[in-house]
């Protein structure tokens, strides 16, 4: 069975599981629809909260950001993890105790001010729409990747599926669906990380393999990444390029922004008691940490694999994933020196923010782009 068939099989099985759970646990009352009848156990709620928190931004973008930015990408780890700690310790239990479902409701009641409530609502709308835009883009990328459709089509498919789950099951159905989703998500994330860690460092624990020596070599993985990055014209992978004040304010913005997300806050109302809300927060932090501590390792493995797979490789011999990404618009190659080799280094390959594809193919079979090449550097990807 080829890779595409296996992808369809496993995705089909997971969606069948989600649909079955959504039907089995569908909401039968208003209480079920909005707060799952306050009958969810702390462990199940912790898993559902973790699945909520670790959406497309974490599952797809976290490792990608760290791979692209190097050590500077750690601000996103600190910001998103810190945001959850802020929410779990200082917001959610007290909102639950106060009896309000949202931050604007709490602020309006606590300060006896409709104006304060309105300001909080406006802030929350901006935060939520910014967050949802990223999530839906991530959904589109995932569906475009395995269905081989346009990203915009992938976004529409994802919206329809989410609408189906939300309307049918309400919070009760979504909660138990997300418990299953967390199990599938963490399995899908950890298994490749473990095997890649074994292949690269002979260490089965990605978090430790990240700082280990390369297999058959006395060179550490991060030292090798630093060396390759400098050779290609980038900053060393483990160097900071941002100032401490930038790091502080980016981390703070992420913390305060994500701490107020309504779809996560409402999770703390689905358990029977305030003490259970605190317990579920602790469980969720453990479940989230499992992925977040693996993300830097996945980023390093992906970066070194990307460089080894494409640098100075003939386009016709490029890995299948490279051409698949090209077909769905995730990557572009412009042969600036017309030698047929992929040359990856620092700088922009093309003029403009993103590639503008034509319907033509180049002489090596690559997708042609309308953008003019940027000849100020050697990068072709």
Name each region found by the language model.
Residues 1, 58-65, 133-140:
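Membrane-embedded alpha-helical segments in integral membrane proteins
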Residues 1-59, 117, 166-169:
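Membrane-interface "cap" regions at the ends of multi-pass membrane proteins
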Residues 2-3, 38-40, 44, 61-75, ...:
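Loop-to-helix junctions at membrane interfaces in multi-pass transport proteins
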Residues 18-19, 50-51, 74-169, 223, ...:
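Helix-loop-helix module between adjacent transmembrane segments
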Residues 21-40, 94-105, 114-115, 264-282:
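Membrane-helix boundary/linker segments in multi-pass transporters
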Residues 52-57, 127, 134, 194-198, ...:
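Hydrophobic alpha-helical transmembrane segments in multi-pass integral membrane proteins
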